Regions:
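Substrate-binding/active-site clefts of carbohydrate-active enzymes
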Residues: 50-58, 67-247
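The feature marks proteins involved in alpha-glucan
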Residues: 1-65, 70-77, 84
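Intrinsically disordered, low-complexity boundary segments flanking structured domains
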Residues: 22, 47-54, 160, 259-261, ...
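Short loop/turn segments at secondary-structure transitions that flank enzyme active sites
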Residues: 10, 69-72, 109, 278, ...
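Detector for glycine-centered tight turns/loop "hinges" at secondary-structure junctions
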Residues: 10-12, 181, 269
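Residue-level detector of short, conserved catalytic/binding motifs and their immediate flanks
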Residues: 2, 120, 270
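Conserved alpha/beta catalytic core and glycan-binding cleft of carbohydrate-active enzymes
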Residues: 215-217, 232-311
Length: 311
């Protein structure tokens, strides 16, 4: 177990932080990082070799979205483990003829009611359900049964928990120092500074990490609309226009384009999916013609209309 003990010259702040790049973390509510080096041997070569045809945009997608903490319980007080899910979940998806499963965020997070959308351990599968190699086995089993794996990924904001990324070295290292751009009023969380190269590199390396080390077939990027607009959930006087006088977050847009160009050029057969709830143009058009570069976009209107109909 370890943490970084930081004594900053900024206001003489002393703090202890979890490692932002830790591969494994203590089970919440504990917050230390854990030295970990798994030696998992993948058995999904057939899927990976043929993924480019199975996971392409001209193929049908039937996606089952799942929150691992509430899908099933081993008993009333115990989560099912990644290893349990490798049996029960795979069998269920096959019986229901789903082509893909989308995991709501499985990166480490401190607060259960957030459903995983407020991350502190971007490089670590949450220890709630087991070890990193156990999650790899779950992905492996899904691939061996021709089921693609999409991960919810949250580059839009992060929580203010003391051990997390916020005010990391006594300064706004990851978040934008301007609260009009660096604080999310809805979620009471911090917003990444997309204009800082080191922050962009952190996030893009994290996307690459999950696609590479965990064989993810796609990333569903959360809360894209909140990234695109400077006035998202802000009243007049609470935001500052960009250099052109409008409400688009040019730094975030540039980051999203760079992200999509990077992952599509680095990994064959993957897809990125935008959860974008407005009418922003060209979300799933190529960057080369001015688009954001996503492969797909959630049809948010259909989702809300369908849920309203059933409820």
């Amino acid at each position: 177990l370890y943490k970084y003990k930081i004594h900053s010259h900024n206001n003489n702040i002393k703090t202890e932080k979890a490692d932002p790049f830790a591969r494994y973390c203590q089970h919440p509510p504990n917050t230390a990082s854990v030295v970990w080096d798994d030696a998992y041997k993948w058995k999904d070569k057939t899927w990976m070799d043929t993924r480019e045809t199975k996971n392409s945009l001209d193929k049908p997608y039937s996606v089952y979205e799942i929150h691992l903490g509430s899908w099933k319980r081993a008993n009333e007080d115990k989560f099912m483990s990644y290893l349990d899910l490798a049996e029960d979940l795979v069998q269920y998806l096959k019986e229901m003829n789903f082509t893909h499963v989308e995991f709501m965020p499985i990166m480490e997070y401190p607060y259960d009611p957030s459903w995983g959308y407020q991350l502190t351990g971007y490089f670590a599968p949450t220890s709630r359900f087991g070890k990193p190699e156990d999650f790899k086995l779950l992905v492996d089993k899904l691939h061996q049964n021709d089921i693609g794996v999409i991960l919810d990924w949250v580059p839009s904001h992060f929580p203010e928990d003391a051990h997390g990324l916020g005010f990391f070295d006594g300064s706004c290292l990851y978040e934008n120092p301007d609260r009009r751009k660096g604080y999310h009023p809805d979620w009471k969380s911090l917003i990444f500074n997309y204009g800082r190269n080191e922050v962009r590199a952190f996030l893009i390396s994290n996307a690459n990490f999950w696609l590479d080390q965990f064989h993810a077939d796609g990333l569903r990027v959360d809360a894209v609309a909140s990234m695109l607009y400077l006035d998202y959930s802000r009243e007049e006087g609470e935001w500052e226009p960009n250099i052109y006088g409008n409400n688009e977050n040019l730094e975030a847009i540039s980051f999203i384009r760079e992200l999509n160009q990077e992952v599509y050029s680095s990994f064959k057969g993957i897809q990125t999916i935008a959860e974008e709830s407005t009418s922003f143009s060209m979300v799933s058009k190529p960057v080369s013609i001015g688009g954001l570069g996503f492969g797909m976009k959630w049809m948010m209107g259909w989702m809300h209309d369908t849920l309203e109909y059933f409820m």
